[in-house]
Structures are given as C-alpha cells and as structure tokens.
A protein has these predicted regions:
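Non-transmembrane, amphipathic alpha-helical segments
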Residues: 30-33, 117, 183
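Charged/polar, solvent-exposed surface patches and flexible loops
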Residues: 6, 19-22, 90, 107, ...
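Acidic/His-rich, divalent-metal-binding segments that scaffold phosphate/diphosphate chemistry
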Residues: 1-80
Length: 224
C-alpha cells in the first residue's frame, strides 16, 4: 500500500477532518475544508501532474501534501496553512514514513493559501487544485449568503484538461449566476492568480470558459 493510501485510511487523519467539520459547522464557515475537499484536491493534483508526465514519486508526494493541507483548519481558516504545516511535520516524523523530499511536501502545505511566487511545481499544483475546488457542494449554507462567495453555489462542475500546450478550464454554471459579482470577488482573483502561476511554470497557455463561452475578463486578468 502506498503511503498516501495509508494516510487516507488513518483514523487520526479522518478524525482530524471530523474536527474541522465540527468547527466549521459551529462557527459557520463559508466553504468546507473537510476530507471530501482534500480528497478532491488530491485527485486534481494527480490528474494534472500525470498529464504533464511527472514521475510517480512527485505525484505521490503531491497527493500526500494535498491530503494533509487543511489539517490545521480545525481551529478556523485564519493561519490554518501554518497550523497544517506544523501538524503534518509532527505527523510525518512520528509515523517515520520513508518519504523522499519530505521538506517540499511540508513547504507546499505551509504556503498553499497565498504564495503564488514559489518555483515548486508540487506547491503550485496544490495551490491551483485547491483554488479550483469551488463547486456548489463545497459551499456552506452560510457561504451562500455572502456577497461574492454566494456565486460559487452556481458552479455545477469545473472541467480541466491539458491539450495542445493549453490549460483548458471550463466552468459549468447554473444560469442564475451574476458574472460581475463573481469576477469582483477576491477569491475569484486568487483563482486567476493560481492559474497564471501554474501555467507559467509548465509553459501552458490558460484558456478559461464559462458554459462553453470564453471567459473574457479572465483573459484580460491573466495577460496583465
């Protein structure tokens, strides 16, 4: 069994994310940072890196970073990346898993909320995959009341593929969404930043669409 699979089945990790769920339910978080979310991130990380022909060790390490990256959200979103780093560092040391380049995993966890300037492909893939997990089922009832954030409740799916040196991202939306409000929201700008940083690192041209139509504002943001 791979280390990633062992971690996913570890009761300590599963219980940790139950703590995250309980905290977010009690404190009315806007989006879930639960096990379902980190598993979504791990799947997207694997898809992207495999399509770019990265080696199995890097893919495994990126998935480990993905599954541990929100373990610090049990005390809220603020500073959760650093708390997740501290938890992951202690956890991996205690488990004594034979992991190569463990520091790169830990660094990716520590910077996943904000650092778009890193040169680490592992970290950039985590950051992008994390930011793209904004589908409707991740948005809480409280989050559906918040201006800007509420627009993500209309995201039915996000399709990502790499084709002919292009990174193609298709947002499939319900018709009720407000494009202006979506574009002005701070987190949408973070999504654009993540797409830009990742694309530049792997020499891909990003192309974003909403319901099969080119997302014009995203093009202007990314090109500038």
């Amino acid at each position: 069994m791979k280390i990633f699979d062992e971690i996913c089945k570890d009761e300590e990790i599963l219980n940790r994310y139950l703590e995250v769920e309980k905290y977010e339910e009690k404190n009315k978080g806007w989006a879930y940072h639960n096990f379902a979310h980190v598993n979504n991130v791990a799947q997207m990380v694997e898809k992207l890196l495999r399509n770019l022909n990265y080696d199995e060790q890097l893919i495994e390490n990126a998935k480990i970073a993905a599954i541990l990256h929100d373990t610090g959200a049990n005390l809220g979103k603020e500073d959760h990346a650093y708390r997740s780093y501290l938890f992951a560092k202690e956890y991996l040391e205690r488990k004594q898993y034979p992991i190569e380049n463990k520091e790169e995993i830990l660094e990716a966890i520590k910077i996943h909320s904000h650092n778009f300037n890193t040169n680490s492909i592992l970290a950039l893939t985590i950051i992008l995959s994390d930011k793209l997990d904004v589908k409707s089922n991740r948005i809480s009832e409280e989050g559906r009341k918040v201006v800007g954030n509420r627009q993500y409740q209309y995201v039915k799916d996000i399709e990502v593929k790499i084709e002919n040196e292009n990174l193609i991202i298709q947002f499939l939306m319900d018709d009720q969404f407000d494009l202006v409000e979506l574009e002005e929201y701070y987190f949408t700008k973070k999504i654009f930043h993540a797409i830009t940083a990742f694309s530049q690192k792997v020499n891909l041209k990003p192309e974003l669409f909403i319901n099969q139509k080119k997302w014009i504002s995203s093009v202007n943001f990314i090109e500038n």
